[in-house]
Curated annotation (Swiss-Prot):
NCBIfam families: histidine_hisI, PRK00051.1, PRK02759.1. This is Histidine biosynthesis bifunctional protein HisIE. It comes from Vibrio vulnificus (strain CMCP6). GO terms for cellular component: cytoplasm. In the N-terminal section; belongs to the PRA-CH family. Residues 123-211 are annotated as: Phosphoribosyl-ATP pyrophosphohydrolase. One of its GO terms (biological process) is L-histidine biosynthetic process.
Length: 211
């Protein structure tokens, strides 16, 4: 989502540039999972470019130039929104990350071991992969071909996998139950993506019911 020029101008005017010596700290947070991904610095030019392009851009203090996150790796940070803290000297930048954020290959710059990532973060990464498959050619993967066949076929697969889960449970085969449950959840995620929804919407509904 690109910010309107007026919104960027409003943020720029509110930032205490003198206090931050021309470089405002920008904390980057995953919009879906709320996980903090990294921190960088923006000067006024980087802030404006971030708003105009919809991709997070920082000012590199070592290279002394603007750099857009993912400009070489492709792991860009797609802007969702930006806001200032109460002191007007720190930005919170909410994003949809495309790929891992850290140059080490991990989801965040505070996560040294990919195996320690939370299950929900991994699930969100899977949803990102499915979103990419949705726009890919039908011959590129099974999932892409499923999207190409439309909602009716995807819904049919969810129904079929639901039956397989029930059969595995009644047979008492726990290993098979796990496998079939994985298939069901995968196809459910595909269906949610097809309908413009995510597992986050389902989780929010569950939270709402259990307040």
């Amino acid at each position: 989502m690109s910010f309107k020029t007026a919104e960027v101008s409003s943020l720029a005017e509110r930032i205490n540039w003198e206090k931050v010596d021309g470089l405002v700290p920008a904390i980057v947070q995953d919009f879906q999972s709320s996980q903090v991904l990294m921190m960088g610095y923006m000067n006024q030019e980087a802030l404006v470019k971030t708003g105009e392009t919809g991709q997070v851009t920082f000012f590199s203090r070592t290279k002394e130039r603007l750099w857009t996150k993912g400009e070489t790796s492709g792991n860009v940070l797609q802007l969702v929104n930006m806001s200032l803290d109460c002191d007007n000297d720190t930005l919170l930048v909410k994003v949809n990350p495309i790929g891992p954020t850290c140059h080490t290959g991990t989801t965040t710059c505070w996560d040294g071991d990919p195996q320690e990532e939370s299950q929900m973060v991994w699930l969100h990464q899977l949803e990102q992969l499915l979103a990419a498959r949705k726009s890919a050619g039908p011959d590129s993967s099974y999932t892409a071909s499923l999207y190409a066949r439309g909602t009716k076929r995807i819904s049919q697969k969810v129904g079929e996998e639901g039956v397989e889960v029930a059969l595995a449970a009644t047979s008492g085969d726990k290993a098979e139950l796990v496998c079939e449950s994985a298939d069901l959840i995968y196809h459910l995620l595909v269906l949610l993506q097809d309908q413009g929804l995510s597992m986050n919407d389902v989780i929010n509904k569950l939270k709402e019911r259990h307040k």
